[in-house]
Protein backbone atom coordinates (compact mmCIF):
# COMPACT_ATOMS: atom_id res chain seq x y z
CA UNK A 1 0.00 0.00 0.00
CA UNK A 2 1.24 3.46 -0.92
CA UNK A 3 -0.21 6.91 -0.12
CA UNK A 4 0.83 10.11 -1.87
CA UNK A 5 -0.36 13.70 -1.75
CA UNK A 6 -0.26 16.67 -4.10
CA UNK A 7 -1.72 20.16 -3.74
CA UNK A 8 -4.32 21.73 -6.00
CA UNK A 9 -3.53 25.29 -5.06
CA UNK A 10 -2.99 26.25 -1.42
CA UNK A 11 -6.31 25.04 -0.03
CA UNK A 12 -7.08 21.67 -1.61
CA UNK A 13 -5.09 18.47 -1.09
CA UNK A 14 -5.32 15.56 -3.53
CA UNK A 15 -4.59 12.23 -1.83
CA UNK A 16 -3.96 9.01 -3.76
CA UNK A 17 -4.01 5.59 -2.10
CA UNK A 18 -2.71 2.58 -4.05
CA UNK A 19 -3.62 -0.93 -2.92
CA UNK A 20 -2.29 -4.21 -4.26
CA UNK A 21 -3.97 -7.56 -3.70
CA UNK A 22 -1.45 -8.52 -1.04
CA UNK A 23 -2.73 -5.65 1.12
CA UNK A 24 -6.18 -7.15 1.56
CA UNK A 25 -6.34 -10.64 0.02
CA UNK A 26 -5.29 -12.45 3.21
CA UNK A 27 -7.94 -10.70 5.30
CA UNK A 28 -10.60 -11.39 2.67
CA UNK A 29 -9.78 -15.11 2.64
CA UNK A 30 -9.70 -15.25 6.45
CA UNK A 31 -13.13 -13.61 6.66
CA UNK A 32 -14.53 -16.01 4.06
CA UNK A 33 -13.11 -19.02 5.94
CA UNK A 34 -14.84 -17.73 9.08
CA UNK A 35 -18.08 -17.66 7.10
CA UNK A 36 -17.34 -21.20 5.89
CA UNK A 37 -16.88 -22.53 9.44
CA UNK A 38 -20.21 -21.03 10.56
CA UNK A 39 -22.28 -21.55 7.41
CA UNK A 40 -25.18 -24.04 7.37
CA UNK A 41 -26.77 -24.76 3.99
CA UNK A 42 -29.16 -27.53 2.94
CA UNK A 43 -27.18 -30.64 2.00
CA UNK A 44 -24.07 -29.63 3.95
CA UNK A 45 -23.04 -30.05 7.54
CA UNK A 46 -21.97 -26.91 9.41
CA UNK A 47 -18.46 -25.96 8.34
CA UNK A 48 -18.51 -28.24 5.30
CA UNK A 49 -19.91 -25.84 2.69
CA UNK A 50 -17.37 -25.65 -0.18
CA UNK A 51 -15.16 -22.54 -0.05
CA UNK A 52 -15.95 -21.74 -3.71
CA UNK A 53 -19.66 -21.57 -2.86
CA UNK A 54 -19.00 -19.31 0.15
CA UNK A 55 -16.83 -17.06 -2.02
CA UNK A 56 -19.54 -16.82 -4.66
CA UNK A 57 -22.13 -15.92 -2.02
CA UNK A 58 -20.12 -13.49 0.14
CA UNK A 59 -16.92 -12.73 -1.75
CA UNK A 60 -17.96 -9.39 -3.26
CA UNK A 61 -19.35 -7.90 -0.04
CA UNK A 62 -16.34 -9.07 2.01
CA UNK A 63 -13.94 -7.73 -0.62
CA UNK A 64 -15.60 -4.30 -0.54
CA UNK A 65 -15.64 -4.28 3.27
CA UNK A 66 -11.94 -5.11 3.61
CA UNK A 67 -10.87 -2.70 0.87
CA UNK A 68 -12.91 0.10 2.44
CA UNK A 69 -11.33 -0.65 5.83
CA UNK A 70 -7.83 -0.49 4.36
CA UNK A 71 -8.53 2.73 2.46
CA UNK A 72 -10.13 4.41 5.49
CA UNK A 73 -7.21 3.43 7.73
CA UNK A 74 -4.68 4.66 5.18
CA UNK A 75 -6.55 7.96 4.71
CA UNK A 76 -6.88 8.61 8.45
CA UNK A 77 -3.25 7.67 9.11
CA UNK A 78 -2.09 9.98 6.34
CA UNK A 79 -4.04 12.92 7.79
CA UNK A 80 -2.71 12.28 11.31
CA UNK A 81 0.90 11.57 10.35
CA UNK A 82 1.11 14.61 8.07
CA UNK A 83 -0.81 16.81 10.54
CA UNK A 84 -3.22 17.94 7.86
CA UNK A 85 -5.48 20.68 9.19
CA UNK A 86 -8.60 19.93 7.17
CA UNK A 87 -12.17 21.23 7.07
CA UNK A 88 -14.75 18.47 7.47
CA UNK A 89 -13.53 15.22 5.95
CA UNK A 90 -12.13 14.09 2.57
CA UNK A 91 -14.40 13.18 -0.33
CA UNK A 92 -13.69 10.86 -3.27
CA UNK A 93 -12.45 12.84 -6.25
CA UNK A 94 -15.14 13.09 -8.92
CA UNK A 95 -14.51 11.13 -12.11
CA UNK A 96 -11.84 8.91 -10.57
CA UNK A 97 -13.91 6.22 -8.89
CA UNK A 98 -12.33 2.71 -9.10
CA UNK A 99 -14.25 -0.10 -10.78
CA UNK A 100 -13.96 -3.85 -11.42
CA UNK A 101 -12.24 -4.42 -8.07
CA UNK A 102 -12.17 -8.22 -8.54
CA UNK A 103 -9.85 -8.26 -11.51
CA UNK A 104 -7.20 -5.66 -10.72
CA UNK A 105 -3.77 -6.35 -9.27
CA UNK A 106 -3.51 -2.71 -8.16
CA UNK A 107 -6.34 -0.33 -7.26
CA UNK A 108 -6.01 3.43 -6.91
CA UNK A 109 -8.33 5.57 -4.81
CA UNK A 110 -8.39 9.34 -5.16
CA UNK A 111 -9.60 11.81 -2.53
CA UNK A 112 -9.75 15.55 -2.07
CA UNK A 113 -9.59 17.41 1.25
CA UNK A 114 -10.10 21.11 2.00
CA UNK A 115 -7.23 22.62 4.00
CA UNK A 116 -7.79 25.27 6.64
CA UNK A 117 -6.18 28.60 5.75
CA UNK A 118 -3.63 30.24 8.03
CA UNK A 119 -5.43 33.05 9.86
CA UNK A 120 -3.74 35.62 12.05
CA UNK A 121 -6.16 37.92 13.89
CA UNK A 122 -5.14 41.29 15.32
CA UNK A 123 -8.29 42.46 17.08
CA UNK A 124 -6.97 46.02 17.52
CA UNK A 125 -7.29 46.43 13.75
CA UNK A 126 -11.06 46.09 14.04
CA UNK A 127 -13.18 48.94 15.38
CA UNK A 128 -16.66 48.51 16.81
CA UNK A 129 -19.17 50.72 18.62
CA UNK A 130 -20.30 49.76 22.10
CA UNK A 131 -23.33 51.46 23.55
CA UNK A 132 -23.81 53.04 26.95
CA UNK A 133 -27.59 53.27 26.97
CA UNK A 134 -29.33 55.75 29.25
CA UNK A 135 -33.10 55.88 29.64
CA UNK A 136 -34.51 59.06 28.12
CA UNK A 137 -37.40 60.94 29.73
CA UNK A 138 -39.72 59.78 26.94
CA UNK A 139 -38.66 56.15 27.43
CA UNK A 140 -39.21 56.44 31.19
CA UNK A 141 -42.65 57.95 30.53
CA UNK A 142 -43.56 55.05 28.23
CA UNK A 143 -42.36 52.47 30.76
CA UNK A 144 -44.31 54.08 33.62
CA UNK A 145 -47.40 54.22 31.39
CA UNK A 146 -46.95 50.48 30.74
CA UNK A 147 -46.58 49.83 34.51
CA UNK A 148 -49.82 51.72 35.15
CA UNK A 149 -51.65 49.79 32.42
CA UNK A 150 -50.40 46.47 33.76
CA UNK A 151 -51.61 47.30 37.27
CA UNK A 152 -55.15 48.38 36.46
CA UNK A 153 -57.80 48.06 39.14
CA UNK A 154 -61.27 47.39 37.74
CA UNK A 155 -60.15 48.73 34.35
CA UNK A 156 -58.91 51.93 35.98
CA UNK A 157 -55.30 52.87 35.23
CA UNK A 158 -53.20 52.60 38.40
CA UNK A 159 -52.45 55.91 40.05
CA UNK A 160 -48.90 57.05 40.65
CA UNK A 161 -48.94 56.85 44.43
CA UNK A 162 -47.09 55.12 47.26
CA UNK A 163 -49.25 52.02 46.93
CA UNK A 164 -48.05 51.49 43.35
CA UNK A 165 -44.48 52.50 44.21
CA UNK A 166 -44.33 49.89 47.00
CA UNK A 167 -45.86 47.22 44.75
CA UNK A 168 -43.21 47.72 42.08
CA UNK A 169 -40.28 48.33 44.48
CA UNK A 170 -41.28 46.61 47.73
CA UNK A 171 -39.35 47.63 50.82
CA UNK A 172 -37.32 50.32 49.02
CA UNK A 173 -38.97 53.37 50.63
CA UNK A 174 -40.08 55.00 47.37
CA UNK A 175 -42.19 57.96 48.51
CA UNK A 176 -42.42 60.31 45.52
CA UNK A 177 -42.63 60.30 41.73
CA UNK A 178 -39.07 61.53 41.20
CA UNK A 179 -37.60 58.66 43.24
CA UNK A 180 -39.92 56.27 41.40
CA UNK A 181 -38.73 57.57 38.02
CA UNK A 182 -35.11 57.18 39.12
CA UNK A 183 -35.72 53.57 40.22
CA UNK A 184 -37.52 52.79 36.96
CA UNK A 185 -34.64 54.27 34.96
CA UNK A 186 -32.09 52.15 36.86
CA UNK A 187 -34.03 48.93 36.10
CA UNK A 188 -34.46 49.94 32.46
CA UNK A 189 -30.75 50.59 32.10
CA UNK A 190 -29.90 47.19 33.59
CA UNK A 191 -32.01 45.59 30.86
CA UNK A 192 -30.50 47.86 28.22
CA UNK A 193 -26.99 46.88 29.33
CA UNK A 194 -27.79 43.16 29.13
CA UNK A 195 -29.27 43.59 25.65
CA UNK A 196 -26.33 45.72 24.48
CA UNK A 197 -23.90 43.03 25.70
CA UNK A 198 -25.78 40.30 23.83
CA UNK A 199 -25.88 42.42 20.70
CA UNK A 200 -22.20 43.35 21.04
CA UNK A 201 -21.11 39.72 20.67
CA UNK A 202 -23.28 39.12 17.60
CA UNK A 203 -22.18 42.40 16.02
CA UNK A 204 -18.52 41.66 16.76
CA UNK A 205 -18.85 38.27 15.05
CA UNK A 206 -20.47 39.85 11.98
CA UNK A 207 -17.77 42.52 11.83
CA UNK A 208 -14.85 40.11 12.11
CA UNK A 209 -16.35 37.73 9.55
CA UNK A 210 -16.83 40.67 7.18
CA UNK A 211 -13.40 42.24 7.69
CA UNK A 212 -11.02 39.27 8.07
CA UNK A 213 -10.39 38.10 4.52
CA UNK A 214 -9.16 34.62 3.61
CA UNK A 215 -9.81 32.18 0.79
CA UNK A 216 -11.49 28.79 1.06
CA UNK A 217 -11.77 25.78 -1.25
CA UNK A 218 -15.29 26.93 -2.13
CA UNK A 219 -16.24 24.43 -4.84
CA UNK A 220 -15.14 21.49 -2.70
CA UNK A 221 -16.95 22.89 0.35
CA UNK A 222 -20.19 23.32 -1.60
CA UNK A 223 -20.01 19.65 -2.54
CA UNK A 224 -19.06 18.69 1.03
CA UNK A 225 -22.09 20.52 2.48
CA UNK A 226 -24.40 18.57 0.16
CA UNK A 227 -22.73 15.23 0.97
CA UNK A 228 -22.72 15.92 4.71
CA UNK A 229 -26.45 16.77 4.74
CA UNK A 230 -27.35 13.18 3.73
CA UNK A 231 -29.89 14.32 1.17
CA UNK A 232 -31.41 17.16 3.21
CA UNK A 233 -29.69 19.95 1.26
CA UNK A 234 -29.50 20.20 -2.52
CA UNK A 235 -26.68 21.63 -4.61
CA UNK A 236 -29.10 24.38 -5.69
CA UNK A 237 -29.77 25.31 -2.04
CA UNK A 238 -26.05 25.51 -1.32
CA UNK A 239 -25.35 27.61 -4.40
CA UNK A 240 -28.12 30.02 -3.44
CA UNK A 241 -27.22 30.37 0.26
CA UNK A 242 -23.50 29.61 0.32
CA UNK A 243 -21.97 33.05 0.82
CA UNK A 244 -24.38 34.49 3.38
CA UNK A 245 -25.50 31.27 5.02
CA UNK A 246 -23.30 28.21 5.12
CA UNK A 247 -19.89 29.76 4.66
CA UNK A 248 -20.51 32.63 7.09
CA UNK A 249 -20.75 30.26 10.06
CA UNK A 250 -17.70 28.34 8.79
CA UNK A 251 -15.68 31.55 8.51
CA UNK A 252 -16.54 32.46 12.10
CA UNK A 253 -15.63 28.95 13.27
CA UNK A 254 -12.20 29.29 11.65
CA UNK A 255 -11.66 32.78 13.09
CA UNK A 256 -12.69 31.51 16.54
CA UNK A 257 -10.22 28.62 16.25
CA UNK A 258 -7.48 31.10 15.32
CA UNK A 259 -8.29 33.27 18.34
CA UNK A 260 -8.17 30.29 20.69
CA UNK A 261 -4.89 29.12 19.14
CA UNK A 262 -3.39 32.59 19.63
CA UNK A 263 -4.80 32.86 23.16
CA UNK A 264 -4.80 29.52 25.04
CA UNK A 265 -6.53 31.14 28.04
CA UNK A 266 -9.75 31.01 25.98
CA UNK A 267 -9.74 27.21 26.29
CA UNK A 268 -12.30 26.17 28.91
CA UNK A 269 -10.91 24.71 32.11
CA UNK A 270 -12.78 22.16 34.19
CA UNK A 271 -12.87 24.39 37.27
CA UNK A 272 -14.28 27.25 35.20
CA UNK A 273 -17.08 24.97 34.05
CA UNK A 274 -17.83 23.91 37.62
CA UNK A 275 -17.82 27.52 38.84
CA UNK A 276 -20.15 28.50 35.99
CA UNK A 277 -22.61 25.72 36.87
CA UNK A 278 -22.36 26.59 40.56
CA UNK A 279 -23.16 30.23 39.82
CA UNK A 280 -25.95 29.36 37.38
CA UNK A 281 -27.83 27.02 39.70
CA UNK A 282 -26.75 28.08 43.18
CA UNK A 283 -25.66 31.69 42.78
CA UNK A 284 -28.42 32.86 45.13
CA UNK A 285 -26.98 30.78 47.97
CA UNK A 286 -24.32 31.96 50.42
CA UNK A 287 -21.79 29.15 50.06
CA UNK A 288 -19.58 30.57 52.81
CA UNK A 289 -22.19 29.68 55.46
CA UNK A 290 -22.70 26.09 54.29
CA UNK A 291 -21.38 23.13 56.21
CA UNK A 292 -19.19 20.52 54.52
CA UNK A 293 -22.03 18.04 54.08
CA UNK A 294 -24.18 20.57 52.21
CA UNK A 295 -21.25 21.61 50.02
CA UNK A 296 -20.61 17.96 49.18
CA UNK A 297 -24.25 17.51 48.14
CA UNK A 298 -23.99 20.55 45.88
CA UNK A 299 -20.78 19.18 44.35
CA UNK A 300 -22.55 15.89 43.63
CA UNK A 301 -25.37 17.78 41.90
CA UNK A 302 -22.83 19.72 39.84
CA UNK A 303 -21.12 16.42 38.90
CA UNK A 304 -24.45 15.01 37.70
CA UNK A 305 -25.20 18.11 35.63
CA UNK A 306 -21.77 18.11 33.99
CA UNK A 307 -21.93 14.39 33.20
CA UNK A 308 -25.18 14.86 31.26
CA UNK A 309 -23.97 15.13 27.67
CA UNK A 310 -26.60 17.61 26.45
CA UNK A 311 -26.33 19.84 29.50
CA UNK A 312 -22.54 19.74 29.29
CA UNK A 313 -22.61 20.84 25.66
CA UNK A 314 -25.06 23.65 26.41
CA UNK A 315 -23.00 24.85 29.39
CA UNK A 316 -19.74 24.70 27.39
CA UNK A 317 -21.29 26.76 24.59
CA UNK A 318 -22.64 29.39 26.99
CA UNK A 319 -19.37 29.71 28.88
CA UNK A 320 -17.23 29.74 25.73
CA UNK A 321 -19.39 32.50 24.24
CA UNK A 322 -19.21 34.48 27.47
CA UNK A 323 -15.40 34.23 27.66
CA UNK A 324 -14.97 35.08 24.00
CA UNK A 325 -17.37 38.04 24.18
CA UNK A 326 -15.38 39.46 27.10
CA UNK A 327 -12.12 38.90 25.22
CA UNK A 328 -13.42 40.66 22.11
CA UNK A 329 -14.66 43.62 24.15
CA UNK A 330 -11.27 43.93 25.87
CA UNK A 331 -9.15 43.58 22.73
CA UNK A 332 -11.03 45.12 19.80
CA UNK A 333 -10.84 48.87 19.28
CA UNK A 334 -14.08 49.86 21.02
CA UNK A 335 -15.74 53.23 20.59
CA UNK A 336 -18.20 53.87 23.44
CA UNK A 337 -21.33 55.67 22.26
CA UNK A 338 -23.67 57.33 24.76
CA UNK A 339 -27.26 57.05 23.57
CA UNK A 340 -30.83 56.24 24.55
CA UNK A 341 -32.60 53.00 23.67
CA UNK A 342 -34.22 54.35 20.51
CA UNK A 343 -30.81 55.50 19.28
CA UNK A 344 -29.33 52.09 20.09
CA UNK A 345 -32.03 50.28 18.11
CA UNK A 346 -31.53 52.54 15.08
CA UNK A 347 -27.77 52.00 15.24
CA UNK A 348 -27.65 48.21 15.52
CA UNK A 349 -30.71 46.97 13.64
CA UNK A 350 -30.77 47.03 9.85
CA UNK A 351 -32.96 49.84 8.63
CA UNK A 352 -35.62 48.80 6.15
CA UNK A 353 -36.23 51.33 3.42
CA UNK A 354 -39.94 51.77 2.82
CA UNK A 355 -40.93 51.86 -0.85
CA UNK A 356 -42.28 55.14 -2.10
CA UNK A 357 -46.05 55.24 -2.16
CA UNK A 358 -47.46 55.02 -5.66
CA UNK A 359 -49.72 57.84 -6.75
CA UNK A 360 -53.31 56.64 -7.01
CA UNK A 361 -55.96 57.80 -9.45
CA UNK A 362 -57.64 59.66 -6.59
CA UNK A 363 -54.38 61.50 -5.83
CA UNK A 364 -54.09 62.48 -9.47
CA UNK A 365 -57.67 63.72 -9.49
CA UNK A 366 -56.94 65.99 -6.55
Summary of predicted features, one role per range:
Residues 78-115, 347:
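Extended, domain-scale alpha-helical bundle/helix-rich regions
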Residues 22, 116-118:
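Short coil/turn motifs at secondary-structure junctions
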Amino acid sequence: MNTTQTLKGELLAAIQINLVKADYEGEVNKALKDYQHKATLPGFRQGKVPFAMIKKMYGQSVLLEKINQKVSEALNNHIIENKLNIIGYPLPELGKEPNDLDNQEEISFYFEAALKPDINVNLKDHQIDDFNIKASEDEIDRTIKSIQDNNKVEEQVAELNEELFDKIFPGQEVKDIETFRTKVAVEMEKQYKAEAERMFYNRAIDKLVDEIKFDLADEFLKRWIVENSEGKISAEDVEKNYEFGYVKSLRWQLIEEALVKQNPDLVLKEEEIRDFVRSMYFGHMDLSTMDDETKERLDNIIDAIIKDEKQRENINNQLADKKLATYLRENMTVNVVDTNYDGFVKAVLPQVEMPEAKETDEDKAE
